[in-house]
């Protein structure tokens, strides 16, 4: 649930507080951590390429990273910006596509990203310290 904890001498109980689940009934709609975990769980069930797809590295720099999981002509691309400033990425598509769908766009705290598919390449603009999953479509 994104609860901060503090390790104390002789005990780690503060790291694992007792929770009343009734206090978190709307956490998926209000808590960014719970929202993303719930979405990732759903996507693992809905997108077999995430579990069974071949791993393909698409780009790697000191600040950004993109890789795909590809299965039966379908692909999901994970894009990461570990830097403190926005980043533009461009890389070859692992499968033919005419567009992308941001699979985490509905999560609490998600930010808009710009994407463009052109000439077999994907261009992505990511905010600082941000990541998402993109399904290639078309």
Show which residues each predicted segment covers.
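Short C-terminal domain-edge/linker segments immediately following a structured domain
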Residues: 25-30, 107-112, 134
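A residue-level signal for conserved active-site and pocket-lining positions in enzyme catalytic cores
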Residues: 40, 100, 129
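Conserved active-site loop/cleft motifs that coordinate metal ions or position small ligands
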Residues: 77-80, 102, 135
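C-terminal beta-strand-rich structural cap/linker in extracellular carbohydrate-active enzymes
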Residues: 115-138
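Solvent-exposed beta-strand/loop surfaces of large extracellular or lumenal domains
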Residues: 101-121
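Short secondary-structure boundary/capping segments
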Residues: 57, 68, 114, 123-124
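Loop/helix patches that line or flank the sugar-binding groove of alpha-linked glycan CAZymes
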Residues: 1-97
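Short, flexible beta-strand-to-coil junctions
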Residues: 70-72, 107, 137-138
């Amino acid at each position: 649930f994104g609860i901060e904890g503090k390790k104390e001498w002789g005990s780690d109980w503060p790291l694992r507080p007792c929770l009343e689940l009734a206090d978190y009934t709307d956490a998926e709609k209000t808590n960014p951590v719970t929202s993303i975990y719930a979405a990732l769980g759903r996507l693992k069930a809905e997108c077999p390429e995430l579990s069974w797809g071949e791993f393909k590295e698409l780009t790697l720099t000191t600040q950004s990273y993109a890789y795909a999981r590809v299965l039966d002509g379908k692909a999901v691309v994970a894009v990461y910006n570990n830097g403190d400033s926005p980043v533009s990425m461009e890389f070859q598509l692992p499968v033919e596509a005419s567009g992308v769908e941001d699979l985490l766009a509905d999560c609490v705290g998600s930010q808009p990203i710009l994407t463009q598919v052109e000439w077999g390449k994907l261009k992505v603009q990511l905010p600082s310290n941000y990541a998402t999953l993109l399904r290639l479509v078309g």
